[in-house]
Amino acid sequence: MRDYRDIIIKPVVTEKSMNLLADNKYTFIVDKRANKTEIKNAIENIFEVRVASVNTMNIKGKPKRMGRFEGKKPDRKKAVISLKPGHKIRLFEGM
C-alpha cells in the first residue's frame, strides 16, 4: 500500500478552484495511478475530514517547444473533492 502523501501531490490554486471553495469543494493534483477510493482515504487521513464525493479528470500535457526541440508537459490527474457539511480543510483557509 502506498503512503497517503504519495497520492496527493499538491493543491490546485486557480481562480476556478477558489470559486469552488464556496461549495465546499477542494481541488488537488493527484497521482495518475490513484483511484477514487485511494484519493478519498488519503484526504480523510491527511486532513482529518469526511469526504462526500470525489470527481477525477485526466489532463493531457500540452505540447511545448524550446527552440528547435519539441516536447510536452507531463500528463496529470486532477481530483475535485466534495466534503460533507461542517468540514473544512485548513490548508485553504484565508485564500
Swiss-Prot record:
A single BP term in Gene Ontology: translation
Any Pfam family matching the protein: Ribosomal_L23
PANTHER family in UniProt: 60S RIBOSOMAL PROTEIN L23A (PTHR11620)
InterPro entries from the UniProt entry: Nucleotide-bd_a/b_plait_sf (IPR012677), Ribosomal_uL23-like (IPR013025), Ribosomal_uL23/eL15/eS24_sf (IPR012678)
Organism this protein belongs to: Syntrophomonas wolfei subsp. wolfei (strain DSM 2245B / Goettingen)
Family indicated by similarity: Belongs to the universal ribosomal protein uL23 family.
GO molecular function: rRNA binding; structural constituent of ribosome
Record gene name: rplW
NCBIfam families in the record: PRK05738.1-3, PRK05738.2-4, PRK05738.2-5, PRK05738.3-2
Protein name stated in the entry: Large ribosomal subunit protein uL23
Subunit structure: Part of the 50S ribosomal subunit. Contacts protein L29, and trigger factor when it is bound to the ribosome.
Annotated keywords: Ribonucleoprotein, Ribosomal protein, RNA-binding, rRNA-binding
Gene3D superfamilies: 3.30.70.330
GO cellular component, one term: ribosome
Protein task: One of the early assembly proteins it binds 23S rRNA. One of the proteins that surrounds the polypeptide exit tunnel on the outside of the ribosome. Forms the main docking site for trigger factor binding to the ribosome.
